[in-house]
Amino acid sequence: MEYAILFAALLAGATVMFLKGLWDQHRAQKWNREQLRKSFGKAGRTEYADGELNGIVRYFEKHPKDFQIDDITWNDLNLDEIFLRMNSTCSSAGQEYLYAMLRSPSFEEKELQEREKLLEFLEQDEETRVRMQEIFFKIGRTGKYSLYDYMDFLDVLGERKNGKHLLVDLLFFLTIAAAFVSPPLGLCGVSIVMCFNITTYLKEKKQIEPYLTSFHYIFRLIRGAEELSGIHAQQLEGRLSKVRKLLPQFGKLNRSASLGMRTSSGDPMGIVADYINMMLHLDIIGFNIMLHAVREQTENIDRLVTIVGELDALIAAAGFRHSLPAWCVPKLTAAETVADGAAHGAVESSGQHFEALSLQLEQLYHPLLADPVKNDIETTNGVLLTGSNASGKSTFLKAVALNMILAQTIHTCCADHCQSSYWRVMTSMALRDDLGSGESYYIVEIRSLKRILDAAQSPGAPVLCFVDEVLRGTNTVERIAASTQILKSLHLSLIHI
């Protein structure tokens, strides 16, 4: 009788704790939903875990394109700060895609128009946006490393078998069965097997922990994609139809995940699952099956990351728009190519001749400035900008270059009006000595300028180049002579400021 009362009390206590956990989880979800509503249009994340930013570049590195913003231009324009200002994404896939999008300008009107329709929809339809953000929030982040870091090292694990784990599971159930026949002997056996299982579990779990984290993320990604597929919005159908076609490919992954690969151990069910995993090694068994399945589905996982990441990144871009005091949708046109010598004053690049090039921005400003001074620019040729010290020349140049990148990535300009050709934007502005290679500032700048001239001779859109204080630090006579030739070469190849 006493044992029954004790058992009932323990059961009641466990039930109360379980129900309280569910209630707390419900309250947390409600609070998170409200925070997502309030945070739209606010500045992005300001706090990052140590090393977290290092993994953000991996999606970009895995998806090269014909032209992407190079490191010199990225650093010259402080685009890391722009990314951080914009990054209100809820998942690792989202922030990695956002970074890649900012470094990969589009030269296709169709692509940018599709992006524009999605941006408008995500800004206006709050309910759908918040629902999607909740899904992305549950998908979450991978932490210090990118999913692509883990994927690159899967081969290190080799082939993994489940025989020994199934054997200890069998022993565990046999000792439990023995406890009904001979309680003292059975309980002793259960204790020994439990200690052995926990010890071997902790040892093996430590070896696979980084990969287990990544597989948890893949599992959450698939679960999130399943939830996304249930959203019905005409503007999203192009992306979500691709998700629905991909989901059947992950059947084996889902089956292996059901063996113990839970998304979280913080909720009540997660705590129970953690103890079951220690006893039965279910998550390790699931990991070994999943390892083989992931190797088979690498390309489909990448496609899923791309779709989910794009939608999360576009919500962040829509929020960035919403946070700006003024912005406009750019009007971009492809440069016209003409036959050799067919047009007077055409600009030549890589044997191509461009005409009708233009750059027009009204009430342009830099989005990182709290109280910016707005300016206009309109030109069809190169511009030599002069002025007194501390008059804002460099800031203006950076604002123009930055806005042309934003125009061709998130289809947004920090200006009242933008009408321009498509450009490959390159800069040479904030260089410094390279002590590691022993190169002086002069050599570093010459190499930087050469890369721009080389780009102008390669196929693609015309190059829009920004050079700040050519060859500063060189003696006056040589600087004037060299700068004249450099500017002349730039003028013959591309529009420059």
Per-region residue spans from a language model:
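ATPase nucleotide-binding head domains, primarily ABC-like/P-loop NTPase cores
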Residues: 317, 324-495
